[in-house]
């Protein structure tokens, strides 16, 4: 969506691909899906991914190659969920993110507990622009509570949000020390 709540398609950025791949690898995420159905955007993602997986970047920066091992490009949310179901042998819990709360909002602590204690896989979806439509979001099991900073401003880049959320869900439990 855009700021007028119109359905749009946002552009993939090189930085988002890199930074989310690196954060996902740091937090031992099994699979990072880039979901896009526009051919020109898919081509951009494929170019970036192949540069780091098999191209010059794979030998120039082997750490970056490692970060791209678990990156997959798919056409739709449904395709990503189907791939996880096939790989894991069961349907995942699907949780999305938003800067607003909903009836099915879940806390970080609750989702972290599910990740640690349940065998069922979890898919966490992130949107770009002004997020996904309300209708799309209502199709999922949960919506993670918003990230609240110290002030009133609440519009993070997707790569910032991914890093913060991965740390809350998969990072060291420093508060237990």
Predicted segments with their positions:
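RNA substrate-binding interface of SAM-dependent RNA methyltransferases
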Residues: 1-99, 163-176
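Conserved acidic residues
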Residues: 30, 92, 121-122, 141
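Secondary-structure boundary/capping motif
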Residues: 41-44, 103-104, 132, 153-154
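Short, glycine/charged-enriched secondary-structure capping and boundary segments
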Residues: 47-49, 108-112, 138-141, 159
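Short, well-ordered coil/turn elements that cap or connect secondary structure elements
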Residues: 68, 89, 117-119, 137-138
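Short, exposed beta-strand "edge-strand" segments with a Pro/Gly-rich flavor and a Y/T-containing core
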Residues: 69-75, 100-106, 151-156
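Long, charge-patterned amphipathic alpha-helical coiled-coil/hairpin "stalk" segments used as oligomerization
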Residues: 95-136, 146
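Structured adenosyl-cofactor binding patch, chiefly the S-adenosyl-L-methionine
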Residues: 130-177
């Amino acid at each position: 969506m855009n700021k007028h709540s119109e359905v749009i398609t946002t552009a993939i950025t090189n930085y988002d691909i890199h930074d989310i791949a690196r954060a996902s690898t740091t937090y031992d995420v099994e699979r990072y899906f880039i979901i896009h159905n526009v051919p020109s955007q898919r081509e951009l993602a494929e170019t970036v991914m192949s540069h780091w997986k098999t191209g010059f970047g794979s030998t120039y920066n082997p750490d970056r190659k490692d970060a791209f091992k678990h990156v997959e490009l798919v056409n739709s949310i449904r395709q990503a969920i189907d791939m996880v179901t096939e790989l894991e042998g069961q349907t995942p819990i699907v949780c999305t993110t938003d800067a607003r709360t909903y009836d099915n909002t879940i806390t970080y602590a609750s989702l972290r507990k599910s990740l640690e204690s349940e065998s069922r896989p979890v898919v966490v979806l992130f949107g770009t622009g002004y997020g996904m439509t309300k209708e799309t979001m209502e199709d999922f099991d949960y919506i993670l509570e918003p990230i609240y900073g110290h002030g009133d401003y609440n519009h993070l880049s997707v790569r910032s949000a991914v890093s913060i959320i991965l740390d809350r869900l998969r990072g060291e439990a420093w508060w237990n020390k």
